[in-house]
Amino acid sequence: MVPYQELTLQRSFSYNSRKINPVTSPARSSHVRSPSSSALIPSIPEHELFLVPCRRCSYVPLSSSSSASHNIGKFHLKFSLLLRSFINIINIPACKMLSLPSPPSSSSSVSNQLISLVTGGSSSLGRRVTGTLYGHKRGHVTFSVQYNQRSDPVLLLDLAMSTATLVKEMSSGLVRIALECEKRHRSGTKLFQEPKWTMYCNGRKCGYAVSRGGACTDTDWRVLNTVSRVTVGAGVIPTPKTIDDVSGVGSGTELGELLYMRGKFERVVGSRDSEAFYMMNPDKNGGPELSIFLLRI
């Protein structure tokens, strides 16, 4: 049996302390330039080696971009000013078919001016007017239009139906009165100045109505003064029993009671040849509805 022996191995450390010269190294010896070729290439100092500009990089000064944006801003400003002036030059027509002017103040002089204007044309009335239907029980109905409940009437229409017939029609809850007149060529007559109208009530021809403009009789003044404090309502006004009682003579034709109905009407202007008055129900409880149309055809 072989006896156990310890073996010791020693490592040897050796290094080469020779420095490698890149000029004399074998890898660079094959790439060393000849003196003739190196003489043709100028030498570049080390401090200027990284300061050579690239041909592909173009330097754009900041002043040129700011001047371009300034020019664009001036162009937008001039264009906006030109557009605004162009819009101001254009006159866009507005629809004045349904436009109603504001009513004037309720003084006596202005009220007289209102009467003269409305008898010549209905454009000075407001959108809300006061309408009164009145007449003797056995006589014809008169329709009065006022700016307010205390002003002078601007339109008086003697309708072609009796008061009793109107009361009977209104008991059905729906009354449509249409007044038509012929349009005359080259006529400057206003709608309220038309003297004669053909009257229709709920589609049935009733006869002819007469317009008196704003001319009031003594009976008209008495009725309107009596109901001047009434805004909405209906009733009976005490009157003489006969026509002759008014003049002082003892006998005559019996007129009957004078009935009236008063309320606010909404006035709608369709054109210079058409207007409408709609009776407004204040409590909206489905009461009698009345509409009066003025048409020039």
Curated annotation (Swiss-Prot):
GO cellular component, one term: membrane
Record carries keyword Ribonucleoprotein: no
Keywords: Endoplasmic reticulum, Membrane
Summary of the tissues where the protein is detected: Expressed in root meristematic region, cortical cells, lateral root cap cells, columella cells of the root cap, mature region of the roots and leaf hydathodes.
Subcellular location: Endoplasmic reticulum membrane
Highest taxon of the lineage: Eukaryota
BP-aspect Gene Ontology terms: chloroplast organization; hydrotropism
Induction line: By light and abscisic acid (ABA) in roots.
Function field: Plays a role in lateral root development by maintaining auxin levels. This function requires GNOM (GN/MIZ2) activity. Negatively regulates cytokinin sensitivity on root development. Positively regulates hydrotropism in roots.
Other observations noted: The Japanese words 'mizu' and 'kussei' means water and tropism, respectively. Plants over-expressing MIZ1 in roots have a reduced number of lateral roots formed, however this defect is recovered with the application of auxin.
Protein name stated in the entry: Protein MIZU-KUSSEI 1
Lineage: Eukaryota, Viridiplantae, Streptophyta, Embryophyta, Tracheophyta
Gene that this polypeptide is encoded by: MIZ1
